[in-house]
């Protein structure tokens, strides 16, 4: 009987390099909350949560880069060990509702596997929102997410 081997290969999608000098940035609407994500119902019927942060950036922006931008405007998040759990809030046109999909976690002062993930790799589309759950270092970090097939 022959031995059977299997290998799990994680393929990284190639991100097309954007010339930030020649390409106009997009408006990224970011909503931060401490300890949890906003409820999807807060994005319904043209409403959004009140604590909006507007960032002009490009599709090749990494989660680490976005973490740095949020830390620049929010001094409470600069402490080492602060977790940033990113999620994309996007419209589901079939059901006329919004849905939320977690895309990665970063931590201040620590390197992580999601640090170099870009908005393009997370399948972010212009018009989507970015919802960030910020967990201070004195609380437990976000629980491990189950692996999703997308």
Swiss-Prot record:
BP GO annotations: heterochromatin formation; negative regulation of DNA-templated transcription
Keyword field: Cytoplasm, Developmental protein, Nucleus, Repressor, Transcription, Transcription regulation
- A GO molecular function held by the record: transcription corepressor activity
InterPro entries from the entry? Hist_deAcase_cplx_SAP18 (IPR017250), SAP18 (IPR010516), SAP18_sf (IPR042534)
Question: What cellular component terms from Gene Ontology apply here?
Answer: cytoplasm; nucleus
Q: What is its main location?
A: nucleus
Pfam families in the record, alphabetically? SAP18 (PF06487)
Q: Where in the cell is it found?
A: Nucleus; Cytoplasm
What highest taxon heads this organism's lineage? Answer: Eukaryota
Q: Which PANTHER family match?
A: HISTONE DEACETYLASE COMPLEX SUBUNIT SAP18, SAP18
Similarity comment? Belongs to the SAP18 family.
Quaternary arrangement and interactors, per the entry? Forms a complex with SIN3 and histone deacetylase. Interacts with the N-terminal residues of TRL. Interacts with BCD; in vitro and yeast cells.
Role, per record: Involved in the tethering of the SIN3 complex to core histone proteins. Interacts with bicoid (bcd) to repress transcription of bicoid target genes in the anterior tip of the embryo; a process known as retraction. Interacts with Trl and binds to Polycomb response elements at the bithorax complex. May contribute to the regulation of other homeotic gene expressions.
State the protein's name: Histone deacetylase complex subunit SAP18
* Organism annotation: Drosophila melanogaster (Fruit fly)
- Organism taxonomic ancestry: Eukaryota, Metazoa, Ecdysozoa, Arthropoda, Hexapoda
